């Protein structure tokens, strides 16, 4: 059976950390920023980890399963 292909959109959006967690960026930080507060925009610019409920789905997209 051939190898699973990695989803091209996923490999651009997710990254693995050294401990094996999956890193992602926040949404809602690309346009229509005038009505959003400085605090909200600042918090959206930091990256975070994928929630544990979605890890298996993301790993499947990244062909890690």
Curated annotation (Swiss-Prot):
It comes from the Bacteria. Residues 1-40 are annotated as: Disordered. One of its GO terms (biological process) is translation. Keywords: Ribonucleoprotein, Ribosomal protein. Residues 21-40 have a biased composition (Basic residues). Pfam families: Ribosomal_L35p (PF01632). SUPFAM superfamilies: L35p-like (SSF143034). Gene3D superfamilies: 4.10.410.60. One of its GO terms (molecular function) is structural constituent of ribosome. One of its GO terms (cellular component) is cytosolic large ribosomal subunit. InterPro entries: Ribosomal_bL35 (IPR001706), Ribosomal_bL35-like (IPR021137), Ribosomal_bL35_CS (IPR018265), Ribosomal_bL35_sf (IPR037229). Belongs to the bacterial ribosomal protein bL35 family. This is Large ribosomal subunit protein bL35. It comes from Bacteroides fragilis (strain ATCC 25285 / DSM 2151 / CCUG 4856 / JCM 11019 / LMG 10263 / NCTC 9343 / Onslow / VPI 2553 / EN-2).
């Amino acid at each position: 059976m051939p190898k699973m292909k990695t989803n091209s959109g996923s490999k651009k959006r997710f990254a693995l950390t050294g401990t094996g967690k999956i890193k992602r960026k926040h949404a809602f930080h690309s346009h229509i920023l005038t009505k959003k507060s400085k605090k909200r925009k600042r918090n959206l610019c930091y990256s975070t980890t994928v929630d544990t409920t979605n890890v298996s789905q993301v790993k499947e997209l990244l062909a890690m399963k």
